[in-house]
């Protein structure tokens, strides 16, 4: 009965979505700050490896992304790496000034694990220079009236732990992550009141252990011949399991040792697109439900029920899906104060026969996920092929989370679009303004229906190192000149946000 109920729920939301599939917007919606609740937070986001630079300075140890991009430049589209990135390590005061200038009330950043613990664990010692850097950043934010939202892990596993036991493939990572999170809470929690344990664990398992296009670059050979090792049928589920347990242990530490005195909140940032059925058939509707089970629900359901989604349990055969002990399940249930949602795009899902050969996390849902239907894209394409613009998906995803997962407090922790890097300083990004206006309008719609959304973070404050695509695309509200001292130039979209947010001050 439970499965039928939730499948029906998916059908209802999918039917609501179908009314405007691939609808083109002819104009930018007009928004006012007063369209959102008074306490609604607007901010911008970055991550450590993408913007900090200073990869080999002040005692920082290497992460798997240093190894992946520096030792194997052919794995990055333009052969670059994040060793300097946007140089926020040295220019953080300027970046905080930009946040203040735009009018943002919060900044979501991540902490570099290997900058705090160069060898990944307590045995390797704590790097005081790393502690000092984040203290300085946090204090600078607060001096400008900007709330820090800190992410503890944004994909940059210390290389030492990867060498020792395979990083998140090894069960040992759970305790090492708990210790690392403990250090963060102890040193920064008196001022940081909003924490995210993990950023996009789904991307870690999909791109790092199935597709093999992101660090540590593991996959089955039949998926990607460039992978030298890996197993897309088993490793993703083990890594995902350890990520979930690491999250649970970190939340447990905070609640037991720090919450009473620091009075902060701990959540997680999950990414997902919305999945619409390819056709109105019952089979495709079920395929859309399974696609959600293997993406958003994969990491959300254990935090609500202590169990994996039923569709995962049913579809992942041959004992490949780990199970939680009763103790672990109890720890995980309710292990969040809020949920961060990273949304960029949506897809169609089509029912396909379940595969018995060349099985991976991608084939287990028995659903073909595509951005096109009969040759027509679900929405206009940004610079990246995967980013098809479908604003209504953000509304439907928020309502899905509300109704299926006990009405959680939610923040949009990432949302944005990219443009191709041309080598010329181009600050006229009207298409980005249109993207944000359309998505914010849909967030506002979700709130009006009852979604408990408390804030919105634009991705990204700065042009940065965009993982496997390097510097070939730009997501920033602020242009960074990577050829001239990392100079910053606010784009038209930054000025659009400033105008939107200045209404509150005028009123």
Swiss-Prot record:
Residues annotated as the enzyme's active site: 200, 414
GO cellular component: Golgi apparatus
Enzyme Commission code(s) on record: 3.2.1.21
Family that this chain belongs to: Belongs to the glycosyl hydrolase 1 family.
Binding site for a beta-D-glucoside: 50, 154, 199-200, 344, 414, 459, 466-467, 475
InterPro entries the record matches: Glyco_hydro_1 (IPR001360), Glyco_hydro_1_N_CS (IPR033132), Glycoside_hydrolase_SF (IPR017853)
Record keywords: Disulfide bond, Glycoprotein, Glycosidase, Hydrolase, Signal
Highest taxon listed in the record's lineage: Eukaryota
Underlying gene: BGLU13
Residues making up the signal peptide according to the UniProt record: 1-22
Transmembrane segments: none
Name used for this protein in its record: Beta-glucosidase 13
Annotated catalysed reactions: Hydrolysis of terminal, non-reducing beta-D-glucosyl residues with release of beta-D-glucose
Cysteines engaged in disulfide bonds, as pairs: 219-227
Glycosylation site positions: 81, 226, 358
UniProt-recorded Gene Ontology molecular function terms: beta-glucosidase activity
GO biological process, one term: carbohydrate metabolic process
